[in-house]
Amino acid sequence: MTLKKTYLWFIIVMLCNLNLTAQTTTARRSSPLTVAPPLSISLSSERLERIDSMLKQSLRDNTIPGAVALIVRNGRIVFHEAYGNADANGKKLQKDAIFRIASQSKAITSTAVMMLWEEGKFRLDDPISKYIPEFKNPEVLVNFKYADTTYTSRPANKEITIRHLLTHTSGLGYGVIDGDERMKMLYHKAGTTDLFTTEPVTIKEVVMKLAKLPLHHDPGEKYTYSMGLDVLGYFIEVISGMSFEAYLQKHLFEPLGMDDTGFYLPTSKGDRLVAIQHKVNDKWENYPNTFYDVNYPIKGAKTFFSGGAGLSSTAKDYATFLQMYLNGGELNGIRFLSRTTIATMMANQTMDLYGNGDQHYGLAFGVLTEQGQAKGGLGSTGTFVWGGYFNTQYFADPKEKIIGIILKQTQGSTGDQTSWKFKQMVMTTIDD
């Protein structure tokens, strides 16, 4: 074989290998999100105006400083509005404002995990120690001394699996926001980084520390909100051979057109980041730095890729991601997930360990049950939902093909009722 033919063969093989990974093309071709009049997709304009009035009234009542709200049906944007201010200095909020979405990152991380699962890279019930050996032989916390943080532990009765990490049943904790003071103290002493940071820390370094700490309980025994999705961010690096940030950029954000979503923002987009605000004597003020620097998306080392809480995004970008799910895993002729995989992700993965029966928990999604639907105002059975630490929320109803997103950036108690009102009122706009 000549050198030229050898080179051509090499190129062909490489191209074939590229097509066998992550997202693939499909004969089905759903369009990117476009704007349409409400009546064209059977939503009531008058009832959408009620939502507009409710949000404006919330500003007058001073329960929120600002919000961006977006409603999509059948892949068409029928409502996309910005209200109030982006900071305490009176800067007007814009529709393309960028928000810290915190735990809404979990759905994106879960999606990336399942894209690799579709390639046959692992099984959901594989022990995580098969890929991250430091998690071998986990221990469960037994006794703890508050005076000096010494503790005793016992061997866990089973290994932590990938499914456990996706469903918050691994027994891992959540450091500074953990509900157990003992875990807060242990995580702090170990120097784990939770949620967000501007320090030169990597997710690998944090995961290595997590692996040495005791668990809340035996894996699979309880639902305990945790850093499991952060562990899976590093797991994606191990499996893919890419940084977690690069994997998401190449296989999700770029092909979906989510141009304003990422762990960190370039300087050119820094002025679009909404300030976090809190109430002081009934007046909105910019939130100060506490256990985290509020400007983490635009300053610092920019090396910590938190799969559980680290992303920032816009309402339209996140709606695009959710629309891919409502399309059965496809958008614009690109297939990201099979509809059969999505069915697995939305199935009850934790049985009766999660919630009060109104929702079950899938693979990083809360999913509305028949009992929840019967209570009203929450969507159809199968509607999937979640939110973020800074007062962001989303829901997507596969039956009615509706997406609702409301994004704010607040901390502390404010009297805000816009989230439940928004969801309830969106569902009443259906006019078919």
Where are the predicted features?
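Short, conserved catalytic-motif segment at the N-terminal edge
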Residues: 29, 36-101, 121, 140-145, ...
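A generic structural motif
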Residues: 84-85, 291, 410
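Structural recognition of the beta-strand scaffold that forms the well-ordered cores
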Residues: 68-70, 80, 100, 164-167, ...
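Bacterial Sec-dependent N-terminal signal peptides
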Residues: 1-28
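Short, surface-exposed beta-strand/loop micro-motifs that present aromatic residues
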Residues: 383, 390-400
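A short acidic/glycine-rich loop-to-helix N-cap element
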Residues: 410-421
